[in-house]
């Protein structure tokens, strides 16, 4: 089921046995989403936004009850859903779990999964994370190793790898906080360096005066 921001059913996604995905004909999809387990987003401490339902479901299985997992269904819808979530749940901490579309990048030169995930993260003022697979997995089969569900189902890292990567991302400092800390650290370092530099200048001035007197 696909819901809009008001919780109204707007469409259905059908997944065939071969993995083909279809939406109900002439249905609304833009800015609509699916919340795994129909969790109350207003009570969630962290909201994780991802593309497909399978990815969102795998992420939910790997996290606790303070985390809500939301599927946008496709990369193009990520920024649209991000705008809805940002406006409606400003109290939440957000994380975007993006797809790494290397197969598309190899053919077309662009990576829509990454690009749209980063765009959504900018809207939500949060970080975007992408699955890290075991060495050689992604390079040998681009299509088979794309999202966090692939990490759980197909990678040597498996569900434990998914849980580790997602939970580490949840508990990492937000990107904006890291930038604040970095700026603060540089400012403190600069303020500490100033007295030292002033002392050096004073010493050089004293040395010049002494040398000048001696020459007289």
Regions found by a protein language model. Give the residues of each.
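Phosphate-handling DNA/RNA-contact segment within nucleic-acid enzymes
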Residues: 1-90
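TOPRIM fold recognition
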Residues: 44-45, 57-216
């Amino acid at each position: 089921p696909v819901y809009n921001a008001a919780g109204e059913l707007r469409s259905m996604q059908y997944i065939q046995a071969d993995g083909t995905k279809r939406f109900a004909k002439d249905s609304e999809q833009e800015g609509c989403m699916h919340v795994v387990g129909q969790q109350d987003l207003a009570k969630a401490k962290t909201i994780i936004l991802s593309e497909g339902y399978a990815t969102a479901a795998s992420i939910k299985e790997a996290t606790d009850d303070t985390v809500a997992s939301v599927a946008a269904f496709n990369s193009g819808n990520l920024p649209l859903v991000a705008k809805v979530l940002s406006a409606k749940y400003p109290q939440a901490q957000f994380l975007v779990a993006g797809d790494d579309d290397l197969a598309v990048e190899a053919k077309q030169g662009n990576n829509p999964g990454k690009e749209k995930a980063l765009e959504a993260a900018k809207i939500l003022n949060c970080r975007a994370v992408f699955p890290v697979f075991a060495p050689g997995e992604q390079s040998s089969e681009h299509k088979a190793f794309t999202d966090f569900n692939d990490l759980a189902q197909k990678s040597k890292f498996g569900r434990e790898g998914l849980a580790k990567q997602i939970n580490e991302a949840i508990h990492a400092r937000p990107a904006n906080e890291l930038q604040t800390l970095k700026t603060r650290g540089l400012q403190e370092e600069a303020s500490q360096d100033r007295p030292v530099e002033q002392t050096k200048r004073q010493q050089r001035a004293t040395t010049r005066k002494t040398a000048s007197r001696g020459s007289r």
